[in-house]
């Protein structure tokens, strides 16, 4: 049977017969007739990323405030940095204290830093 003869035979089939043919081919050859999803174009990827819910956040120390020592202590607790490293980070504000963390962890860090007197932003 040639390809043209097969095409003619397929054209003469009903929708139910075509469905049965597809199922038989899938079973016989161990394949799936699922439609492959093409990757979106570069412009579409940016739009899709904007629609997706953000899952990673950065905690940014914007301003130390009046109580610098308490903010340094809070930074040390959150980051496990040494005293000098935490002090340098606080003095370099605005600075990311935690990066790529979950929403819950970012909120907890923000509360701890604000309780110490700092101004914090989550991005």
UniProtKB/Swiss-Prot annotation:
Protein keywords: Ribonucleoprotein, Ribosomal protein
Disulfide bonds: none
Protein's UniProt keywords contain Nucleotide-binding: no
InterPro entries per the UniProt record, alphabetical: Ribosomal_bL12 (IPR000206), Ribosomal_bL12_C (IPR013823), Ribosomal_bL12_C/ClpS-like (IPR014719), Ribosomal_bL12_oligo (IPR008932), Ribosomal_bL12_oligo_N_sf (IPR036235)
One Pfam family, short name: Ribosomal_L12_N
Listed GO MF terms: mRNA binding; structural constituent of ribosome
HAMAP family the UniProt entry points to: Ribosomal_bL12
Function text: Forms part of the ribosomal stalk which helps the ribosome interact with GTP-bound translation factors. Is thus essential for accurate translation.
Subunit: Homodimer. Part of the ribosomal stalk of the 50S ribosomal subunit. Forms a multimeric L10(L12)X complex, where L10 forms an elongated spine to which 2 to 4 L12 dimers bind in a sequential fashion. Binds GTP-bound translation factors.
Full protein name: Large ribosomal subunit protein bL12
């Amino acid at each position: 049977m040639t390809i043209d003869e097969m095409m003619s035979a397929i054209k003469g089939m009903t929708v139910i017969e075509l469905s049965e043919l597809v199922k038989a081919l899938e079973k016989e050859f161990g394949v799936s007739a699922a439609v492959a999803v093409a990757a979106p174009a570069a412009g579409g990827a940016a739009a899709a990323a904007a629609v997706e819910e953000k899952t990673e956040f950065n905690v940014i120390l914007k301003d130390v405030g009046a109580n610098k020592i308490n903010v340094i202590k809070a930074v040390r607790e959150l980051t496990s940095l040494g005293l000098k490293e935490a002090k340098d980070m606080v003095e370099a504000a605005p600075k990311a204290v935690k990066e790529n963390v979950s929403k819950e962890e970012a909120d907890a860090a923000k509360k701890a830093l604000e309780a110490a007197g700092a101004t914090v932003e989550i991005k």
